[in-house]
A protein has these predicted regions:
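Bacterial N-terminal signal peptides
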Residues: 7-18
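Histidine-rich, glycine-flanked metal-binding segment
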Residues: 32-36, 47, 51-87
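Metal-associated gating/positioning segment near the N- to mid-region
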Residues: 84-153, 215, 238, 243-246
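Active-site gating loops and adjacent loop-to-helix segments of metal-dependent hydrolytic enzymes
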Residues: 97-118, 126, 157-158, 162-165, ...
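Histidine/acidic-residue-rich catalytic or RNA/ligand-binding cores of hydrolases
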Residues: 101-104, 148-149, 240-247, 278-292, ...
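Divalent metal-dependent hydrolysis catalytic cores, especially in the metallo-beta-lactamase
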Residues: 118-144, 158-169, 191-203, 230, ...
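Histidine/acidic residue-rich metal-binding segments in metalloenzymes
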Residues: 180-190, 194-200, 207-272, 288-289, ...
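His/Asp/Glu-enriched, well-ordered alpha-helical/loop segment
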Residues: 226, 296-299, 307-394
Length: 420
């Protein structure tokens, strides 16, 4: 019922967005969608193809929503992006797109109105798209579903959304028997889930202890596979090994995983999505807005400060494990939407990740983890025309990720602030 109300409220947002575009030439210039059937040619001097290669002095031809050709002689040129760095739209594997601060400035909870929830969700989606993220995985809330639908139908501008709907929260035996967990997975599939999010550990604010048995995790991951769904498991410490052995798709966080755990993940083809900084930095920056709301205490904030260096060390260790697939996810919550790219800087500066590897983690590797490698994540013929341009070269200066000047998703230009 709440999701239905939010969807109706999202429709109301459209009228406000329309009025804003009419009253602001800057907004209309950057957000006015282009006809999707028009043939578009982009000229670029530097293209990161999303797979680890750099293309020089080429042109990208778009027809409808897809990349039709990469041809240095194509013309006429519609967008001259020479002097910028062109690359695929980024993919964030872990966000909470509907989280926001309420009217009182605090982390919004169940007391917010559906109207407020809808407005803020739409604003979060817009901020995320403008930051260069054309696909996100929101894990999860039932409110994700109407937002996903509104964006997919073109009613609202925002990134492509994949959602877990409701997560499976580990509470030991109270979580349910293996059969009950299987039923939970089937229920999420029926509700429209693209994946299953599983909490196999407490929050790091509560110590990060394991909360599900091997039998429970085996049931969840096995049933998800039967339903054609991927599994993302929030796991710390021992839960990393248990979830990996259960056959999950991706480990979220992974703090305090051992080197043997990381090697096991590489052997089993399990993706790792660590967070090097943004999520904790955002919590600390907005401490007054979270403190006192459910799950946020002084002790919890002290715990987060202590593990920040452990997160840096995890990224450093993981990057040295042959064959381990590290994807890009931010765990963006209230206060972080639109600042997702800061995680790139944290990973390169504090985690020692190679800048090209950082870009690939949010492009082709992120698409592979989502099972969408044949649709998004690369500048390649036949894939969706999700294309962004940066003022600067992130391979030389990772801070260039803050300077997104062009955003195209599915062949539609939503932002064009490139110098002319």
């Amino acid at each position: 019922m709440r999701s239905t109300k939010v969807f109706l409220c999202l429709l109301m947002v459209l009228g406000v967005c329309g009025q804003a575009q009419q009253s602001s030439s800057q907004v209309s210039k950057q957000s006015q969608p282009m006809p999707t059937e028009k043939r578009i040619v982009i000229a670029a001097s530097t293209v990161l193809d999303g797979r680890g290669r750099v293309l020089r002095n080429t042109r990208i031809v778009i027809e409808g929503s897809k990349i039709a050709a990469i041809d240095s002689k194509a013309g006429p040129v519609d967008y001259d992006l020479r002097g910028l760095t062109v690359l695929p739209g980024w993919i964030d594997a872990h966000v909470h797109i509907t989280w926001s601060f309420g009217k009182d400035g605090k982390n919004a909870g169940s007391g917010e109105t559906t109207q407020d929830a809808a407005y803020r969700a739409a604003a979060n989606a817009w901020a995320t798209l403008m930051a260069g993220f054309t696909t996100v995985q929101s894990v999860g809330s039932p409110t994700d579903v109407p937002l996903r639908g509104a964006i997919a139908k073109g009613l609202l501008p925002g990134p492509r959304i994949l959602t877990a709907v409701e997560p499976l929260t580990g509470r030991g035996e109270r979580t349910g028997t293996p059969d009950e967990i299987r039923e939970f997975v089937r229920k999420q599939k029926a509700a429209g889930a693209d994946l299953i999010k599983i909490f196999a550990s407490q929050s790091i604010r509560q110590g990060g202890a394991i909360t599900l048995s091997p039998e429970q995790l085996n049931a969840a991951c096995d049933e998800a596979k039967k339903q054609g769904l991927r599994t993302l498991v929030h796991a710390y410490k021992d839960a990393v090994r248990v979830a990996t052995r259960a056959g999950c798709t991706e480990i979220e966080h992974g703090t305090m995983a051992t080197d043997d755990d990381l090697k096991l993940m590489a052997e089993m083809g399990t993706f790792l999505d660590p967070q090097a900084g943004l999520v904790i930095e955002n919590y600390l920056l907005n401490k007054d807005k979270y403190l006192g709301t459910p799950g946020y205490t002084e002790e919890g904030f002290a715990a987060m400060e202590k593990v920040l260096s452990l997160n840096h060390q995890l990224v450093q260790r993981a990057s040295k494990v042959p064959g381990l697939k590290i994807v890009f996810g931010t765990d963006a919550v209230a206060g972080a939407h639109g600042r997702n790219a800061e995680e790139f800087i944290d990973r390169v500066r504090d985690g020692g990740i190679d800048p090209m590897a950082a870009m690939v983690s949010a492009n082709s590797l992120g698409a592979e983890a989502m099972g969408l490698a044949n649709q998004i994540g690369s500048i390649a013929v036949g894939l969706e025309a999700d294309i962004i341009a940066l003022d600067g070269d992130p391979l030389k200066d990772i801070a260039a990720v803050r300077r997104v000047v062009v955003v195209m998703k599915g062949g539609v230009v939503y932002k064009n602030a490139a110098r002319r």
